[in-house]
From Swiss-Prot:
Cofactor: [4Fe-4S] cluster
Protein name as annotated: Phosphomethylpyrimidine synthase
Details of cofactor binding: Binds 1 [4Fe-4S] cluster per subunit. The cluster is coordinated with 3 cysteines and an exchangeable S-adenosyl-L-methionine.
Top class in the EC scheme: lyase
Lineage: Bacteria, Pseudomonadati, Campylobacterota, Epsilonproteobacteria, Campylobacterales
UniProt keyword annotation of Transcription regulation present: no
C-alpha cells in the first residue's frame, strides 16, 4: 500500500492533496515537496470514507484537535456523539477518541463512519478492554494486535508512546520530578515495562508497527510519555531524552513512507515555549508538532482552557502545527458539552493568534471584522466571529435602542462619533 508520503515522493498529486491545496491556497509543488520530506502530513486512512482531508505542518494553518470518549465513571456514548456534532459545527479538523473503558470498537466504528474530521486514538488505552486481560497478563505482541484493529477500523492517526524505551526510562528514574509521568498511555507502558522487566513493546517491535501503518496509511503520532505535567518538570532531561528517541523513530518511519507528527508538552512556563518548539523542529527535521496546551501555570483549575490558550498561542506562533484543546474541566472531570464548547473556542482563538504571527495572510478575516466594527455592521460581525452565536446572544441580552452603538457606550460610541464627524456631520451626545 502506498501512503500520502510515498505518493508525494513519486510526484503523484492525490485527491487528498488537491483538497488540502485548495483549502490552504498552496501550490502543487509546495505540497508535494513538503509531504515528501515529512514537514506536512495528511492523515487519511484508506478506510475512513467520510473524511474531509486536512493537512498539518509547515506553511499551513494551525489545526485543532478535540478529545472525547468514555471512562469507567462516565459511559454515555450519546453525549460523546453530541460532542462530535459540536466539533463539526466549529470546523474542528481532528477528533481523538480517548475511551479507556469496556469494548470501544462500536463507538469508534460509528465515529469513523460519521466524522469528516480526521480520527485519532491511543490503542494502549484500549488494550485491557479489547484483550480482556489485566495489564500484567498482556504480552508484547498483544499490543500490536490492538493497533491492527484500530488501523483496520479507519483511524487516521494513532498516538504511540514508542519513545519511552529502556534508555529514556533510565533517565526518567534519575529525574527529580514533582509529577512523575502524567501521560496515561505512558504510565501504562512504563508500569508494564517495570512489571515484566521488558523493553517497550512499541519500541521493540517498531518495524511491525510500521508495517501496520503502511497497510492502511495510518499516520504515527509519536506520543510524549515523559511530557512535563508541571511547570517545574518542563524541559528536563527526561523530556528531552525522549524527544531525541522520537527523532530517531521519525526517521525510521519516513524511510518506509509513514507520515509522522510529534506530540509535545504539557505544562511549561511561557518563556520556555519558543525554545521547545525550535528544538523539536531541529531534532525531528521539521516533522509537524502537536502540543497539548501548553499550560503556562499549574494553579488554573477550572480555567485551564485559558492557561492552555495562552500557551497554545505562543506555541503556534513559534511553530506548533496542531493544538490539542484544553477544557475548563481539565484535571477535574470528564468534560460536558459546555466545557467542550469553551475548550474549542479558546483553542481556536489560540490557533488563530498563532497563525496571524506566522502566516500574515490569515489576518484577512480580522481585517474584515475591523471594517464591520467601523461600519457598525452587527450581522457581519456575528458572521465573522469565531463563536458568532454567543456574540449575537450577548448583544441581544442588552440590545441598545440605537443600533449604531451597543449598550456599553450608547451615544458615546467611538465608531459612530468618528463616522459622523468624518462625514462633516455634527455629533450630539445629549
Amino acid at each position: 500500500m502506498k501512503t500520502q508520503m510515498n505518493y508525494a515522493k513519486e510526484g503523484i498529486f492525490t485527491k487528498e492533496m488537491q483538497i488540502v491545496a485548495q483549502k490552504e491556497n498552496l501550490s502543487k509543488d509546495f505540497l508535494l515537496e513538503n509531504i515528501a520530506c515529512g514537514k506536512i502530513i495528511i492523515p487519511a486512512n484508506i478506510n475512513h470514507k467520510s473524511l474531509d482531508p486536512n493537512g498539518i505542518g509547515f506553511g499551513l494553518r494551525t489545526k485543532v484537535n478535540v478529545n472525547l470518549g468514555v471512562s469507567n465513571d462516565c459511559v454515555d456514548y450519546s453525549e460523546e456523539m453530541k460532542k462530535v456534532e459540536l466539533a463539526h459545527k466549529f470546523g474542528i479538523e481532528a477528533i481523538m477518541d480517548l475511551s479507556n473503558y469496556g469494548k470501544t470498537s462500536r463507538f469508534r466504528d460509528e465515529l469513523v463512519n460519521v466524522s469528516k474530521a480526521m480520527i485519532g486514538t491511543v490503542p494502549v488505552y484500549d488494550a485491557v478492554g479489547f484483550l480482556e486481560k489485566d495489564l500484567k497478563q498482556i504480552n508484547a505482541k498483544d499490543f500490536l494486535d490492538v493497533v491492527y484493529h484500530h488501523a483496520k477500523s479507519g483511524v487516521d492517526f494513532m498516538t504511540i508512546h514508542a519513545g519511552i524505551n529502556s534508555r529514556a526510562a533510565h533517565i526518567f528514574k534519575q529525574s527529580k520530578r514533582l509529577t512523575n509521568i502524567v501521560s496515561r498511555g505512558g504510565s501504562v507502558l512504563y508500569a508494564w515495562m517495570m512489571m515484566k522487566d521488558a523493553e517497550n513493546p512499541f519500541f521493540e517491535y517498531y518495524d511491525d508497527l510500521l508495517d501496520i501503518c503502511l497497510k492502511y496509511d495510518v499516520t504515527l503520532s509519536l506520543g510524549d510519555a515523559l511530557r512535563p505535567g508541571s511547570t517545574h518538570d518542563a524541559s528536563d532531561g527526561a523530556q528531552i531524552s525522549e524527544l531525541i528517541e522520537l527523532s530517531l523513530l521519525t526517521q525510521r518511519a519516513w524511510d518506509v513512507g509513514i507520515q509522522v507528527m510529534i506530540e509535545g508538552p504539557g505544562h511549561m512556563a511561557i518563556n520556555e515555549i519558543e525554545a521547545n518548539m525550535q528544538l523539536e523542529k531541529r531534532l525531528c527535521k521539521g516533522a509537524p508538532f502537536y502540543v497539548l496546551g501548553p499550560l503556562v501555570i499549574d494553579i488554573g483549575a477550572g480555567y485551564d482552557h485559558i492557561s492552555g490558550a495562552i500557551g497554545g498561542a505562543v506555541a503556534a506562533a513559534s511553530g506548533a502545527d496542531m493544538l490539542c484543546y484544553v477544557t475548563p474541566a481539565e484535571h477535574l472531570r470528564l468534560p460536558n458539552l459546555e466545557d467542550v464548547r469553551e475548550g474549542i473556542v479558546a483553542t481556536k482563538i489560540a490557533a488563530h493568534a498563532g497563525d496571524i504571527a506566522k502566516l500574515p495572510k490569515e489576518r484577512a478575516r480580522d481585517d474584515e471584522m475591523s471594517k464591520a466594527r467601523q461600519e457598525i455592521d452587527w450581522e457581519k460581525m456575528f458572521k465573522l466571529a469565531i463563536d458568532g452565536e454567543k456574540a449575537k446572544k450577548m448583544f441581544n441580552e442588552r440590545r441598545p435602542d440605537d443600533l449604531n452603538s451597543c449598550s456599553m457606550c450608547g451615544k458615546m460610541c467611538a465608531m459612530n462619533t468618528m463616522n459622523q464627524i468624518l462625514k462633516g456631520e455634527d455629533v450630539s451626545l445629549a
